[in-house]
Curated annotation (Swiss-Prot):
GO terms for cellular component: plasma membrane. PANTHER family: INNER MEMBRANE PROTEIN YPHA-RELATED, OXIDOREDUCTASE CATD-RELATED. Pfam families: DoxX. It comes from Mycobacterium tuberculosis (strain ATCC 25618 / H37Rv). This is Uncharacterized membrane protein Rv3486. It comes from the Bacteria. The chain crosses the membrane at residues 19-39, 63-83, 87-107, 119-139. It is a multi-pass membrane protein. Signal peptide: none annotated. It is found in: Cell membrane. Belongs to the DoxX family. Keywords: Cell membrane, Membrane, Transmembrane, Transmembrane helix.
Amino acid sequence: MAITGSAAPSWPRLLHAEGPPSVICIRLLVGLVFLSEGIQKFMYPDQLGPGRFERIGIPAATFFADLDGVVEIVCGTLVLLGLLTRVAAVPLLIDMVGAIVLTKLRALQPGGFLGVEGFWGMAHAARTDLSMLLGLIFLLWSGPGRWSLDRRLSKRATACGAR
């Protein structure tokens, strides 16, 4: 039974990849940061992987640190390649919101992160996370740009649909 109408997935729209050539700069940097962060969770488990997750109070720290590392490696690579970019951005967005909530909002409490209290301490601590969050929202909204595998897939899907 074929899916028709509004229930049918719109792959050409999901893969749509136009926009200025400069989008590649954002996509490559966002993908590279997530890929490198994911790899580092396995290279330095005490500082960035399960050890860090335990220190901030995450239950089942090894499981969640490994899951986080795999998500960052896989989705970071997809973003880097411009392949299923919008799909890959969603788990990374969830990852960043979780990182901000679990590690940065504590700075709003007295004596919080870096011993700096209040909003400015949190803003300082969260600057990289917020920048990555903004980059992911941009890619989710605009797509991966002209120089991406999504664009090639989109052209192919559009050509197949025109037949």
